Amino acid sequence: MPRAAHGFAFDGGVEPVVRVGAGTSLVVETYDCFSNKVSSSEQLFGREHELLDLIGQYNPVTGPMYVDGAEPGDRLAVRIDRIELGTFAPYAATLVTGDSKGVCGGHWSPLDDGLPDTRICPLDGDTVIFPTGVGDLRLPVRPMVGSIGTAPAAGAASSLEFRPRHGGNVDCPSITTGSTVMLPVNVPGALLFLGDVHASMGDAEVTGTALETNADVHITVDILKAADHPGDEPVTPRLDTATTLGSIGCEFGAPLERNLQHAFTDLIERLRTGHRLTRVEAYELLGAAARVQVNQCVAGGWTAVHVSISRSVVPDPRVPGPGMVHTDSAPNDEGAG
């Protein structure tokens, strides 16, 4: 899909750019979150509205893609095969406006001395060059897809936001080469959108921006039919790798604790329906072995998290074992133990 075919919403009313079948691999071209209109360190923005006057809106997403056979209730599985950075322009940009300081806004007065600030970071193979007053720092690239989602059941949702029922701007560093994102399908064809690639991003995206860049994202799409997974009803997007199972808590406007609850609840259900554990067993296993990555924690209610567990400690669903199968009505199948 060409980057020129982009918008600023996850919108089921938009005509598909391309129509593909399950199992199709293709390339999605993207702009950065500033539509590649911030390209010089001399572009400084004392107020956020000055930045918006230049770029119009944040977070262009390329799409939508219609996937034949995807129906409401199914899940769309999107495998990230490769991320090529800087294919449109070989740099990443990060900035802080004078009135939008991220986590440290209003709390760390020394920031005021250096704001606003814009930093243009050239891409050099597997390295991004981060300029500072004491010389250039060379950071290893950690490519990731920041925004990926399907169309909501009704209306449109801003590409800057995120919701459990369709994904969106979840900014999860683990959405990278080799991972598979599983998104709810709400409309026929799913209508997939993708954008906001980062060359690297620190956990929590504390400034509000990462190393924002353009890219060509190679993906493969597949469909997980609802009929093939009875009883398994995801409450939020899922993210798996070769070594982990995971869920993403992403209710826009919710506090961090609630998004942790969403992700843990979904992962408990995954372990129950797919790996033969009771809810209590799954809960206690997660208490012992889960890992939590804070994707975003920029301002009040702007949070998203990724909770994962290693496949090595999860029962293999293909191998039955004594004492591992319990009914939902078992006395110890509810509660925190």
Protein language model regions, located:
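Short, Lys/Arg- and Gly-enriched loop/turn segments at beta-strand edges
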Residues: C33-L44, I83-T94, G189-A199, N295-V298
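Conserved mixed alpha/beta catalytic, RNA-binding, or beta-rich assembly cores of soluble enzyme
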Residues: V141-E257
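A generic structural signal for residues embedded in beta-strands
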Residues: V28, R75-V78, L183
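Intrinsically disordered, low-complexity linker/loop segments enriched in Gly/Pro
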Residues: R82-T176
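N-terminal, Lys/Arg-enriched amphipathic/low-complexity engagement segments
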Residues: M1-D53
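Short, well-ordered loop/turn sites that connect or cap secondary structure elements
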Residues: V20, V67-A70, I175
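Short, structured beta-strand/loop micro-motifs enriched in basic residues and often containing a Trp
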Residues: P2-D11, L54-T62, S158-H166
